[in-house]
């Protein structure tokens, strides 16, 4: 699976003595052989600074046609560092050690070469990967398949590995899963690979436990405690969940997801298992489904419809069963050891102080064993504060003083290696095992083919002809390594690769190889060809120097071919300490000397520090030289000022002489410049014929090409115009098609609108008929109700009319009685001729005679309400034919008048409307209805309701006679004015009434209002 590049940069140091393999690197195979040649000492593996990945190539087999097998002396084996045993022998070399060719690998100091026959170990033909920047590439690299190159890269990705292993474990059958758990649990009781046979009988190793694992007593106690909790407090669901948690622990341990910055893997895996168990739990399924059904969120039909979509594992129909006792014991042991490891890591993290931060990034290889070393220090009870040095080793405060530390002992390193090995992922452990086996195989094979020989020098190599190139060390200094190399062209010719014929080298002076120091491409390595030596007389064809190194440090120098990227050899050397007191004081040496090669990053850092120290030293010297130069310049300036002063202080003659000399010098220089310009002009005027011919040829070519260009431009313009015309025609067709489409769309829209309008009109017509029918039905009901109301009102009005007629008859009877009384009084007055008063007739009166008074006047009513002689007469019953004055017209009061209508026909149009005379001042105003009374309606109401309290009807005879003499008077006015209106016993709301009346003078009155209105205003 793909892995992130971030984890590849965190690869651990490949040190065999600490027991850790390259967890983030994968073995790359060469095309010639499938065997691997890997050195776990950290020096032979050359890593890149940019991609941080290493190719661990294989060695060539004996059947490889490139390597000739004629003689043992002519066979060259690529050097490789020795195992951990070789590190112990490293200090035996004074100025360094080298492991290179099986026959010849030299380390020379001051011209003396020493053979390293016992330290020689290595396969043939190794290869390192170049750095991404600044590396030399050959055309042969283009044939490398990118897929094959990508397949050789294995990056560390603990989270993906852990989840993949967990998924794989959950899919295994129960029997296979039990076997896996048994194997995993048995690993906790096995001794570490670094433990010796005597450690099995050591009480400390058994009961205290090796580094990274608890002791045996602690494991037994934790297993018993967890087993007690398992049997007493955990129910079936919890036991099954804990059983899957054991699978999670196995996956985390094998995938390496529980270490470093991958703490979130534990939570993710536990969450996945917990969610699976919660979803598959029958009780939780019943609770959730019952809650959803009771709250009507889903229906049973919907549940039965979609229930088949769920996997069969989630549709549990019966409760879970308890796991077997064997699986329970294995799960208890695995979980107990996981809890113990977490507790130990937490305690170690809390009690151990953090290493000091220098503000710079620490080498990933150097910091690989930091946590393991801290845990080892915690387990051993060491109270010395420590931190990780630049070379990846623990450096304490006492190390600066003594240079030695107890944590670097063999037992401490063994525990440290055991803990690192226990934290490696499963695939890293497999890779480490394979690498170790292949390395031992290559080492034993190389030793079997290698024969020891006597020390040799460069003079001993004269006249030797080897089939392949050879590189050896000539001198080792504190900051430089000098080397020499043989001729590589013969090797290319013998191999038949054809690299020189293809032009890979380009020239004889091109470097046939380049240098990598500790896996990093070394830019300060210089290689030059030896030209003075005759060919064939000496083996030295190339000499080089590796500069920029730090003193007292171990380096692994790899020499790689430029054309094939194949390693020629790998030599491990150690630079001596610097004896210069001044440089020692300026350059800070490592706090603890390292006898193994550092990582590329550490190597570059040390080189940078050394270069900076030298630069600072040169700067100080330059600063000192600048100060000295400033002093010298100041002295010279003083002398120059003195000479100038002496010159200016001279006489005028000397000054004029110097001026004339200066002018002569200027004239001579000007003449020389003029002559030179004249010569150039002469040369320019005479143009050579050859140049003129060339110019004419070039001009003809230019004109020809210009003509071709113009014709091409014309063709291009014509083609463009034709294409433009075609495009314009196509655009016109497109626009017309778009217009037709728009017209069709508008027509379609219009037709759709008409169709919708017709459909809506049809629907609306049906609704309109229904609405009209409903309105007609409602109107008929309202008319029926109104008709019933009018019928009731007509019945009430008819009853009221009958009551009015009865009362009118009574009033007419009273009027008849009054008329009879008046007639009797008139008769008495006629019989008595005396004056009306004792004093006689009043002035202005016209006493009437009996002859002047007609008989018909005796029957007229008096206009006044005053009674004769102050007497009031009771009402008399009149004849049924006598009627009152009608408001419609005036009629005679004589009972025998033939034109007078009967009394039962004379009633007003409205029962509450009547005309009032001038005698009643209380009824001159027209009032409103009772439903909307004004300020005067209270007066009207009181008089109207108090009609029975009016004064008795009285007549004044004199006034009656005076009115009779006045022309146009109405004989029935007094009677009409003396009548009180009769109130209606009912009120009718919402109706209108009107009335009119007339008297003898032609006056009329009208009124309008509600049925409660009783009077009309007279004009």
Curated annotation (Swiss-Prot):
**Organism encoding this protein:** Aspergillus fumigatus (strain ATCC MYA-4609 / CBS 101355 / FGSC A1100 / Af293) (Neosartorya fumigata)
Annotated function? Component of the regulatory network controlling carbon source utilization through ubiquitination and deubiquitination involving creA, creB, creC, creD and acrB. Involved in resistance to acriflavine, and required for normal growth on a range of sole carbon sources, including fructose, cellobiose, raffinose, and starch, and reduced utilization of amino acids, including GABA and beta-alanine, as sole carbon and nitrogen sources.
Name of the protein in question: Probable ubiquitination network signaling protein acrB
Q: Which gene encodes it?
A: acrB
The protein's topology relative to the membrane is: Multi-pass membrane protein
| Top-rank taxon, per record | Eukaryota
Biased composition regions of type Low complexity, renumbered to the chain: 44-66
Q: Which family does it belong to?
A: Belongs to the acrB family.
Biased-composition ranges, Polar residues, are 30-43, 68-83, 131-143, 580-589
UniProt lists compositionally biased (Gly residues) regions at 992-1008
According to the UniProt entry, the coiled-coil residues are 602-788
Its annotated compartments are: Membrane
- Keyword Coiled coil tagged: yes
